[in-house]
């Protein structure tokens, strides 16, 4: 895993999870090789992923559709790059 996204949101975790699954099925699956989604609580999650194309990920996250979804659902993402030690 090389990316960690910590998200807070006003919608429920189930709504966020459905959105992530929809995104993976409709295009993001082309650049996400593997992932884990963890529910911290009803309004916070941690998404760990192995991303193979950071440019494509950035384009998706900054698309008008994604920005609208984030705004409508009060979603704020903090994205971290990870590097395996040892």
Report residues per predicted region.
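Short S/T/G/P-rich N-terminal loop/turn motif that feeds into the first structured element of a domain
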Residues: 1-69, 75-86
């Amino acid at each position: 895993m090389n990316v960690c996204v910590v998200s807070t949101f006003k919608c429920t975790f189930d709504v966020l999870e459905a959105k992530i699954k929809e995104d993976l099925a409709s295009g993001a699956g082309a650049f996400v090789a593997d992932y884990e989604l963890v529910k911290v609580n009803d309004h916070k999650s941690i998404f760990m992923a192995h991303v193979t194309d950071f440019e494509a990920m950035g384009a998706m996250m900054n698309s008008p559709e994604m920005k609208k979804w984030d705004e409508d659902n009060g979603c704020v993402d903090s994205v971290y790059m990870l590097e395996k030690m040892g």
